[in-house]
Amino acid sequence: SVGFKAGVKEYKLTYYTPEYQTKDTDILAAFRVTPQPGVPPEEAGAAVRAESSTGTWTTVWTDGLTSLDRYKGRCYHXEAVLGEEDQYIAYVAYPLDLFEEGSVTNMFTSIVGNVFGFKALRALRLEDLRIPNAYIKTFQGPPHGIQVERDKLNKYGRPLLGCTIKPKLGLSAKNYGRAVYECLRGGLDFTKDDENVNSQPFMRWRDRFLFCAEAIYKAQAETGEIKGHYLNATAGTCEEMIKRAVFARELGVPIVMHDYLTGGFTANTSLAHYCRDNGLLLHIHRAMHAVIDRQKNHGMHFRVLAKALRLSGGDHIHAGTVVGKLEGERDITLGFVDLLRDDFIEKDRSRGIYFTQDWVSLPGVXPVASGGIHVWHMPALTEIFGDDXRXQFGGGTLGHPWGNAPGAVANRVALEACVKARNEGRDLAVEGNEIIREASKWSPELAAACEVWKEIRFNFKAVDTLDPS
């Protein structure tokens, strides 16, 4: 009979379509699905698709008022994960019409908004997204990008050096500005607010901005180099955040900062648009990311958060170090570093890249290595990240036995020695320690740093690793 038939139906009958040919305009997703015992992978994969597109738990009469075939997400392939008896990678295609243009917020609300609480699933992780060209073109992306930043700063041919001011909380604005000045005059390109420095009773944001601007201009006058400090504009409301960015622009400083996950994608995109319109660079901190991305079987991989940030907008983003104190396995890290910087990235499962991604000339984002790094790590960082990166030495600058400025000198000397050696054809991975020792013979600041940190190691096994192939 023709008409509406009530009742509960199996998701796989509607949403599991292995014969589907994906379109260039589809958003493609790779989910790591761990079904409850007794739930077949096709049903679990189709359930994910249904909840994140047109489905609900029962047949509804309003299904007949639209074209479900046009709007539904489709699970078009499922594959078992090697070495895991109950995990599957489910590949899903979402039609582009399901998403609002230029909105990372809407994209995530649709794809990961409700489905992670599904009872049929023990765990679920979004491993990767393929963003189609048609959707990318609805986003502004990074305010400026890697090349424009180099032109603004007049710095070429090497990574840029930074330092997070410590202690992160408790300094007065004047003492904070003094620490900034010492680091910048010693040879760093940038200093940085920590992610939780906003506007607390011991240091209100306006005072911090003023003293940091004074430090920047004094260091610039003494060194002849353009300097910057990542002024954290993150605030409790979008209006307050923009007010802080406006004040930074009025001071004439080159860069502001945002905590994009705690601040939210709507706020981040708003700030990125303001920065593009007003010539400010935008540094992005990923505070809270490990809550979402650290567990291998549940949550969302950082490569997805990195792609989302490139759409939403940011000129730098923290991306792990491989060698420091924070989580980050080498092949995985290099995979999403390429997704941040390059214009075209081929599918490469050996680096965790599930889809070929074309960014159609959207500006790139410079990865920031930060967390537990010091001068002995400089050869590895230069070799791993190349020139288009930012190396942030917080304790590795401020912990120098002679003070901030000598700490900055040590890092700058180590960096320039590594870049020079690399340009001469030396292998940083093999000769790194020798290169640092040679440079320390003529730099007492570097020699002192080498002595302090010669025994420091962070040797822990990464939690998030690649699947066996």
Curated annotation (Swiss-Prot):
- Which reaction equation describes what this protein catalyses? 2 (2R)-3-phosphoglycerate + 2 H(+) = D-ribulose 1,5-bisphosphate + CO2 + H2O; D-ribulose 1,5-bisphosphate + O2 = 2-phosphoglycolate + (2R)-3-phosphoglycerate + 2 H(+)
Keyword set for this entry?
A: Calvin cycle, Carbon dioxide fixation, Chloroplast, Disulfide bond, Lyase, Magnesium, Metal-binding, Methylation, Monooxygenase, Oxidoreductase, Photorespiration, Photosynthesis, Plastid
N6,N6,N6-trimethyllysine modification, residue list: 5
Short name of one Pfam family:
RuBisCO_large_N
This entry carries the following GO cellular component terms, namely:
chloroplast
Q: What else is known?
A: The basic functional RuBisCO is composed of a large chain homodimer in a 'head-to-tail' conformation. In form I RuBisCO this homodimer is arranged in a barrel-like tetramer with the small subunits forming a tetrameric 'cap' on each end of the 'barrel'.
Q: Where is the signal peptide?
A: none
Q: Which organism is it from?
A: Antirhea lucida
Q: How is it modified after translation?
A: The disulfide bond which can form in the large chain dimeric partners within the hexadecamer appears to be associated with oxidative stress and protein turnover.
Q: Where in the cell is it found?
A: Plastid, Chloroplast
Give GO terms for biological process.
photorespiration; reductive pentose-phosphate cycle
Gene Ontology molecular functions:
magnesium ion binding; monooxygenase activity; ribulose-bisphosphate carboxylase activity
Which NCBIfam families does the UniProt entry name for this protein?
A: PRK04208.1 (NF003252)
Q: What is its EC number?
A: 4.1.1.39
Q: Per the annotation, how and in what number is the cofactor bound? A: Binds 1 Mg(2+) ion per subunit.
Record's protein name: Ribulose bisphosphate carboxylase large chain
Q: Where is this site: Transition state stabilizer?
A: 325
**Family membership noted in the UniProt record:** Belongs to the RuBisCO large chain family. Type I subfamily.
Entry binding sites for Mg(2+): 192, 194-195
Q: Which residues form the active site?
A: 166 (proton acceptor), 285 (proton acceptor)
Please name the InterPro entries in this protein's record. RuBisCO, RuBisCo_large_chain_AS, RuBisCO_lsu_C, RuBisCO_lsu_C_sf, RuBisCO_lsu_fd_N, RuBisCO_lsu_N_sf, RuBisCO_lsuI
Superkingdom as given in the UniProt entry: Eukaryota
Which residues take part in binding substrate?
114, 164, 168, 286, 318, 370
Function, as annotated, reads: RuBisCO catalyzes two reactions: the carboxylation of D-ribulose 1,5-bisphosphate, the primary event in carbon dioxide fixation, as well as the oxidative fragmentation of the pentose substrate in the photorespiration process. Both reactions occur simultaneously and in competition at the same active site.
